[in-house]
A protein has these predicted regions:
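Basic- and aromatic-enriched surface patches that contact anionic nucleotides/nucleic acids
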Residues: 1-9, 18-128
Length: 128
């Protein structure tokens, strides 16, 4: 296990070093209420469930579990919705949010072209 800050996650997303929607992932389905509750949890300092990511042989990552949360965080960072206080991200001093630490479980060196990542996704689903 390791930790990433939200700032580091955003950097991975923007550099296209992590794929939030590999082919086996469902579409983004969280409601606005779900999204606001997640952001509220971050501002309150509550721990979030682990994010599971695969590190492919090419050094890039795939989000196996945590796509809804990661997408919500990125959408909020880009001021696509307001939080429970009816404010956009840009209306706050950013450091508290960006320095929030996410727990990451990294599963290494898979070859997604062989479908191995889908097997890992199945295992993650079984543990829920």
């Amino acid at each position: 296990n390791k930790e990433l800050t939200i700032r580091e996650l955003i950097s991975l997303i923007e550099s296209k070093s992590i794929n939030l929607r590999p082919p086996y992932q469902r579409n983004f389905i969280w409601t606005p209420k779900d999204q606001r509750l997640l952001i509220d949890s971050i501002y309150k300092g509550y721990p979030l469930p682990n994010f599971f990511i695969l590190k492919n042989k090419d050094g890039k990552y795939e989000m196996v579990d945590g796509q809804q949360r990661a997408t919500t965080i990125y959408k909020y960072y880009n001021n696509e919705f307001k939080d429970n206080r009816k404010k956009f991200f840009k209306e706050y001093a950013p450091d508290f949010f960006l320095d929030y630490r996410l727990n990451i479980v990294e599963i290494g060196n898979f070859d997604s072209s062989k479908g191995e990542s889908k097997e890992v996704r199945s295992l993650c689903d079984e543990r829920k």
